[in-house]
Amino acid sequence: PNLVLSQPKDAKEAQNMIYTAFASKKPFCVRYPRGNVRYAKNKSYSLIPIGTWEKFVVGTPTQIVITYGPDVDHVINKARENKMGLLVVNARFFKPIDEVMMKDLLKLNLPITVYETDIKKGGLSSAILEYMNTLDEKIHVLGIGDHYVCHGSIRSLRIQEGISTECLFEELEKHG
């Protein structure tokens, strides 16, 4: 109960997330992905309101991608490269999810794709779909099924599981 689940998009957000975790009065998990990121020391730390997401607009959005961790920047960069208008959401909190932003996103009446490079079951897409269970909205989900993934390079495993950014953009083309 009251467990906060989060995953920062970069080193700066990670430092602020840990600062937020120590300041909160709740059990708090900060997930981090395989691989590494460049360290960028914060000169000062700021609290991130628990359960809030942030939006990034690329061009004139025709679709929404909800993702987290380093994939936020990967999707933004790939959208710019492909000249695709997207609203990219940094879903830095899985629990609680940002219900206010979800309602605002639904009002935009754009196709929504949840892009997670982790197991879908019990992940962000599950939390969003659970929240939207009584609504008639179309959400597309890319993620790893409920099975063991063998060892390998991050790139080869993402291709194998259908969760590379190339796979994401193939999926987006189907809905665009």
Regions found by a protein language model. Give the residues of each.
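Thiamine diphosphate
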Residues: 23-176
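Conserved thiamine diphosphate
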Residues: 1-23, 171
